[in-house]
């Protein structure tokens, strides 16, 4: 049977309408958590979050990436990537994501950071506005031996 280690959350914007900034080509940090992982191996980390995005342009997409071990964006630390189409609407939609990190090395604390960005990735065009809410959370457990 598995054993619970820690649960942490990070809320960047708790309401619709915030932060109210455009999605840019520069990855923007919207959540950081430091899970207390007690130097155990065989960890199961489940990461979940949601963002509110709005766009009046057809074909709008955005990307979310989760990095392990840093609060500064570094492509070498990316463990999860989501590329999402935005529904054409004058109102915002909320987009949820879930990832697991089954390869995290043993550490007293494991940091995870969530970034949202636009620009160009694989020839896709990213645009839109971050209109909230924005939240990121994670649960750490030790898997069965």
What name fits each language-model region?
Residues 1-145:
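Extracellular jelly-roll beta-sandwich "head" domains, especially the C-terminal globular C1q domain
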């Amino acid at each position: 049977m598995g054993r619970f280690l820690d649960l942490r959350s990070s809320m960047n914007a708790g309401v619709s309408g915030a932060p109210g900034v455009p999605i840019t080509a520069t990855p923007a940090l919207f959540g950081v958590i430091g899970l207390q992982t007690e130097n155990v191996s065989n960890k199961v980390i489940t990461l979940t979050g949601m963002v509110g995005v709005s766009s009046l342009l057809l074909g709008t997409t955005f990307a979310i990436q989760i990095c392990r071990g840093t609060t500064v964006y570094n492509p070498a630390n990316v463990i999860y990537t989501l590329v999402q189409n935005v529904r054409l609407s004058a109102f915002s939609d909320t987009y949820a994501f879930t990832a697991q990190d089954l390869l995290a090395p043993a550490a007293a604390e494991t940091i995870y950071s969530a970034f949202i960005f636009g620009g160009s990735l694989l020839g896709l065009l990213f645009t839109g506005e971050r209109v909230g809410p924005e939240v990121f959370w994670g649960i750490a457990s030790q898997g069965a031996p």
